[in-house]
Amino acid sequence: PTKSMEVPGGSSITVTATALKGSNVTASLGGTKVKLKQQSNFVQDENGTKLDENSDFAVYSGKISIPASTSKVQSLGRIKVYASFNGLSATMSGASVSVSAVIPTPEPTPTQPDTTEHPSTDKPSDTTDGGTGGNVDFNPSKMLTPYAYAGVAGRSKMCEITSLCETMPANVVDDCVPYSSPLPAGTFDYISSEYTYGGSKYYRLASGRNILASKTKLIAQGYNLPQNKVSVVSSSSNSDATTIKFGFTWKVPFNVAVKNQSYIPSSQASGGSLYAVTAFNGKYVDITFSHSGNVVGKINVSGSKIVSAAQWITDSKAKTLTLRLTLRTPGRFYGYSVGYTSDGCLTLKIKAKPASSLSGSVIMIDAGHGGNDSGAICAYNPNSSKKYEKQINLLLAQKIKAKLEARGATVIMTRSNDTYVSLDARANMGRTKNPDMFIAVHCDSSESASPMGTTAYYYQAYSFPLASAVHKRIVSAYKSSIYSGAGSATLNKIDRGTNMYPFRVTRIEECPAVLIEYGFVSNIRECKLLWSDSVQERLAQATVDGIADYIASN
């Protein structure tokens, strides 16, 4: 980073620098020094632009830990980066960094305990039950807010989420992670501290996460609220989903995360990702409610196709309640939706397996870029009117759509012509249109003309199986037909892997979501192939076959 920033204590800052390949690169801040690691296949931006692989330079990256916050702002000075190579050395300065001060937050006052039914504080309690589940009286009009006195002494700095807001763990300053889920509009929380990064203001919440301040309404003197009680209003299952409705004393923050998932070491992952996988093997879905200590009502999952058991876990020290839903089959998960519905309940839907074949599946195809967002410029142009990545993306997407529909699938397009659709709007379609899967169609680009090949990207671990299945088919199509007869020097460059990266359109929870880079438009030979109608047909067929493989094996 280069802009001045004020960051929360206990977090970390990612420092990146460009230096000659093979250099020794370190970064220092406030007496802390770290070694930066050279990164491979580094993605520069949301467009997936790659660095020139043949360049003498590479990107180096590492994290600097920030000391704990105190009652006053602490100045750490400027980030300094040192690089040395074969007797040459250079030093550069980056952002000026300070540590934000702590804002005192109150201890929630417990509500009157409900002695008729609540979880054990020592171990998980099984709340699976027959019948409809829930059946607890809940009146949303009686929910408390920080805008009115709630019987608890004192007032605090608080905020209300005003629109769906992505979150980051408290120790992360500027990056999203798959185990930190978004918060819906209407959620309240105490503000522990605030900081600025990249010109944007962030709040660190008492629940242990960081959010963009622009997604909230500040309540400078909010009335303190009591400890929350969770009421299970209802639970049911059908062929589409397992649905659980919750009522609250007040709209507390919560987090949804797939647990017991294995990740590969960052040193083995493309770009050094901390959350890359080689398979999806998650066993549980944990829904953790902050500022909470009591629950009433039972959950019925007896008819669920996706969940086999439900347990409540309490953590009295952290003041959280966690509902653990055990997956009926480990490694089989198809997404979830959660938000407040018109009845005032927080409604969680765990999606069941949508269909057993392409026929009956609902698939969203996202043709990347469009309108005034042209994407990358093509190195080869069939004629003066065909020269942008956005055009190839749409042609490919239309062919994929036709082939899917021919096999009985329903296809939703984020765009069907040359129009601009924002990244947020595309992601929102994936959240609200209820597709079974989301596939973004893109072409790659580099600062150099030499890189070639195809890459698949995922964000959530449960999106990896779809990304991998489609990628394998596309690689096979290139090797067996599109580049048929090519030498090993070409064939060995085709498979660029199935990689984790937080593209905006893959950061959705409602279904498996992937982004496919079909080839490099910056490579003249490959760009010419990507403009070929017959090659587009083969790539579209490979995509459809990959989707079918995913459905059959998952």
Sequence positions of predicted segments:
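Short linear recognition/processing motifs and adjacent strand/loop elements at protein termini
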Residues: 1-11, 16-18, 22-26, 30, ...
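Solvent-exposed loop/turn segments at secondary-structure junctions
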Residues: 369-372, 416-421, 443-448, 461-464, ...
